[in-house]
Amino acid sequence: MKDLSEAKQELIKSLVKNKKFHQLEFEVNSLLLEKRSPFLLNLLGVSKISKVPTSKEDLNESLDLFKEAYLKDRTLIDALFNYAEISIRLLKYDEAKDLLIEYLSKKKYDYKATLALARIHFYLGNMNDCLINYKKIIDNNEANSKLWSAFLFTTNYTYKYSQKDYLNFCKKYSEKLEKFDEKIIKKFQYEKNPKKIRLGFFSADLRTHSVAKFIEETLKILKKDNYEIIAFSNNKLGADDLTTERLKGIFHEWYDIVKVNDLDVVNLIRDKKINILFDLTGYSTGNRCEIFKNKSAPLQISWCGYCNSSGLKEMDYLIADENLIKKEEDFNYTEKIIRLPKIWNSHYLISSEIKINELPAIKNKYTTFGSFNNYGKLSDETIETWSLILKNNNSKLVLKSSVHDHQLLRDNIKNKFKKNGIEGEKIIFMERLKNYDDHLKMYNNIDISLDTFPFAGATTTFESLWMGVPTITLSGEIFNSKFGLSINKNLNLDTFIAKDKNDYIEKAKIISSDINKLSQIRYSLRNLAINSPLFDNKDLGLELCKILKDKWRLFSQQNKNL
């Protein structure tokens, strides 16, 4: 900037201040004809990404500009941060990762660089490295609510922290959440003995999402059973879709709260006389923990969207089932546990018209294992175990993810398998498909599904079973590591539940060797699933209706003076 004339400096300052980025881009481009200074290169990059609208070409050009600026002047740290940010948006962060690591190796700590590196590791599926960087930010007392939530959510993907550690982290985060002054919060408006108990449902996923697949039919049962159901939707702007419209037709009332501040949401929920408020988000994206920290409803229940403890003392209950959380395991959760007698969730019935094809192994002469789980769930232990299976079997592995699928991530996964002795031709990546029926038909390429651990699959396991593909699962110690256990138990498929990694490997070997039995299972599994609790929405809904009435009755008896 100091190399410019005083008039040019004032012009650029004015353009930046008034957000005239198109004109700024023109001015900087003309100056660069004389001298490609790092400052001007970075400024041109900023002008390109600040324009409205910003094109893909602008983003790609800015990426090159930020990189050139930083490599010319390693003291221009803003250029590095800008380069990292745009590289994440464009999924081109291999070089940015190396530059951030190099920068941080010379500097004890830097918030922006550490955060960018954590995000890159997350998108590459390096969850332990992601957690290391998140933890550095937390230890330096620079973690905001969004980062804390991301950290807590990510701990579910690895064995890095115990459940005891996790609960301690939750407690620390809870202490940082804003507790509103009672003077500005409206008093509870609920009726103790209402004709209809009013149930509130908070979620950021009332759209085409796994959460909707599990709650839609249950909501209909609750509605029929004399409950009033009210939605508090935190769907991000533009995310509403046909599923949203369908859900709106089920709820008695619907409130979009994504642009409403937490205090006003708390008061809104109290105004609406909500008796029981469900959190369907937990620490997932779009959460609003302050709403529950400030006790928006007299009873608050965590269910479906986040299957671990919230760690909030204000959260009264967590819904699980008899298989997921044994009574002797209650100490792992701050909430009281509501145990549904069969299964914690039931999936809506999928179309029976989707054909189940012949077992691929019959034609292929080898076993095709598969996992359609989020690639972030492919922990180091999972890849190590799957590699041993692939070494010991005439087999291949099909992978597909509905989120965070890009070439750098695939390459990283292949490299992890290669370190475990498995070459790339053994690993087959399938493309993400938008059409749901087409997605389900891809299970016709798989003989046996392999579950991930410690974070097990839920939606993917329901879908796999529907398509006649059984899932080998490893039972863990906490809620979200036992999805496969509960699902298989409800189908009496104990043969597919492994007690440890060696047992998991042995089961894969034995089950894949019996082609005839596997073929029989394939054609009988859908009917078995249809007639099980997995898809019995009515039974689950009625059980929940009864439990909620009991919980409200108990609360009313214990709080007569409220």
Language-model region placement:
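Short alpha-helix at the nucleotide-sugar/activated-sugar donor binding site of glycosyltransferases
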Residues: 465-466, 489
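Short Ser/Thr-rich beta->loop micro-motif in glycosyltransferases that lines
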Residues: 281, 451-457, 475
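Active-site donor-binding acidic/aromatic loop of nucleotide-activated sugar
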Residues: 256-258, 409, 425-435, 453-454
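Short acidic/histidine- and often glycine-rich active-site loop of Leloir-type glycosyltransferases
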Residues: 481-492
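Short hydrophobic beta-strand element within catalytic cores of glycosyltransferases
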Residues: 470-479
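Donor-sugar nucleotide-binding helix/loop cap in glycosyltransferases
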Residues: 450, 464
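Alpha-helical solenoid repeat scaffolds of the TPR/TPR-like class and their adjacent stem/linker regions
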Residues: 1-366, 384, 415, 421-422, ...
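A conserved nucleotide-sugar
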Residues: 226-228, 387-419
